[in-house]
Amino acid sequence: MTKLAAFIAASLLSTVALAQGYPNRPVRVIVPWPPGQATDIAARVVAEKLQQALKQPFIIDNRAGAGGSIGTDAAVKSAPDGYTLLAASSGPISIMPHLQKTPYDPDRDFAPISLVALVPFALVTHPSFPATNAKEFIAHLRANPDKYTFSSSGTGASAHLITELFNSMAQVKARHVPYKGSAPALTDIVGGQIGYTIETLAATIGHIKGGRLKTFGTSFAQRTAGMPDVPSIAEAADLPAYDIGAWVGYTAPAGTSRETCVRLSGEIQKAMQASDLKERFISLGMDAVSNTPDEMAAFMRAQQERYGSIIKSQNIKIEQ
């Protein structure tokens, strides 16, 4: 064996050994949102499972602000040693870089680990809206262009883009009314001041079950575990390409060893099989999922392209 070959072999063995011994001290999980937000809760549920499996504390560190970019930037600037992870989500990574300059590069600054949740949205309107299903809803909007308004939690928010995509694919015209958060955006639909929106299942399910809103479908192509009796919009409106929502995942700073990412991904995939975790996610309005680092990387790229396409085609801009 040459000296070079011996060096490479020794390096590989050393890397594997480090991964097998990982973690040997507490791991910090940066959540770029305040406590109690959906990404925060999902990250905590997964962190508990990782802590049980790997016998080290996984400590949640909330770094909220600037639409998630402050915490995201703090995570990517941390040492790539596996001891700082990020509870990543669609807003800061898939959407924000298309709307404004961010201090991180979504294509270069992350080492993907695994998805942990898909966040379905629901098309909702006031119970008095003159339609009983998605096709009737679309037909009514087409017959009344620009008569109706749709709300969102803010210009450029997931709900805004997801509703704009629906409007485009369904070939309907309505006026956008942005709010500061999903709660007031839904309150004015409940009150009859706004026509409709497509907002997270977590935010809408209480209103739907309470009879204050009615729904015509959910946003992913497949039905969601949280409302299995409600068809997808793709199914109900005959829009097979309509397949979109938000996501939550775990990533690490770029440069984190592949072995560490694979180890964490494997533990997350095992955790996601637990029935208690699946039920917890359903109660949060999410679907528990997992994948490999390579699959996560491909998913993140696809989501960036999807949201970027919506922003460009609809000419969406936010005030800087």
Residue positions per predicted region:
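Bacterial N-terminal signal peptides that target proteins for export
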Residues: M1-I8
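N-terminal secretory/targeting leader peptides
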Residues: I8-A9, I233
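N-terminal signal peptide c-region/cleavage motif recognized by signal peptidases
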Residues: S14-A17
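N-terminal (or domain-start) structured segment
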Residues: A19-D109, K147, T155, Q171-T200, ...
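An extracytoplasmic/periplasmic, membrane-proximal ligand-sensing/linker region
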Residues: N24-P26, V172, K209, R258-Q320
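Hinge/capping helix and adjacent helix->loop/strand transition within the periplasmic-binding protein
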Residues: K77-T84, S90, H98-P184, I233-E235, ...
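A ligand-binding cleft/hinge motif common to bilobed small-molecule-binding domains
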Residues: G91-K101, H160, L165-M169, Y196-V230
